[in-house]
Amino acid sequence: MVKTETKHSDAEQLVRTKLDELIEFRSQTDDIKEFWGKQFDLGLAWVQYPEGAGGLGINPKYQLLVTEKLREEGISQQNRVANILGIGMGAPTIIEYGTPEQISKYLRPMFTTDEIWCQMFSEPGSGSDLASLSTKAVDDGDGYIVNGQKVWTTLGHLAKWGLLVTRTDPDVPKHRGLTFFIVDMESDGVEVRPLRQITGEAEFNEVYFTDVKIPKENILGSLGEGWRVSLTILMNERVAIGGNVRERGSGAPGPVSYTHLTLPTILLV
């Protein structure tokens, strides 16, 4: 019991010390993205993640100390809303399945909202049956060539990166022939078509892939592991969306609307 309490005390003190440094940094910048970058570098983005990946390698319960302190200081935490598909769903999935290089490359600009993320699951002909998807990725030696279509892609027109599930092996049971990729949404052959709502807004999109080349280092997880990665992302989605619910009648914008209202300019408040 004493040992456990000591560990708790040490972890709490570590977070509070880091928070003091972060709050002090606030007086040095009016750029909220720079502030979020400092938060990441101090390990206060996700305290449970490894050091160097926005975390401190400690129990996630200590993240509450960070959240409460930033709220107390009146500092915006809306990056978690503006880039909810990245921070809420992409980050934990990349931590679980990504390579060290992927973790190093993607997480920091994701947290600062310099790079917005989307996910691409649904297809016009597959309905709710994810395993029946038909978007194909064919090995051409040093990468994969992707052809197909996705639909209902939230924030696809704003995203720099997308999480894409494809079929890489048509000759095995459908759940086993899937592979996940991290795709650059600015790649040649990627076409994003906004789906206009009656309000005139376009939160959702169709995304077309025509001979899109994706390097092999952009595979997330292992070849053929796409079904497992998909289930992880969907689990993370429930947690992320549930944690950002707005009270009905509050007048506060939801996660997607907030992104439209604030990007590309977000101010420190």
Predicted regions: what is each one?
Residues 235-237, 241-258:
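A conserved active-site cap/scaffold subdomain adjacent to cofactor or substrate pockets
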Residues 147-193:
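A short core secondary-structure module
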Residues 113-121:
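A short, Trp-centered hydrophobic/proline-enriched beta-strand micro-motif
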Residues 1-84, 95, 101-105, 109-112, ...:
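Amphipathic, small/basic residue-rich leader segments at the start of a protein or domain
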Residues 212-229, 234:
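Long, acidic (Asp/Glu-rich), low-complexity accessory segments flanking structured domains
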Residues 259-265:
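Conserved small/polar residues in nucleotide/adenosyl-binding loops
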Residues 186-213:
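Flexible, small-/acidic-enriched active-site or ligand-binding loops
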Residues 135-138:
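A structural signal for short hydrophobic beta-strand segments in well-ordered beta-sheet cores
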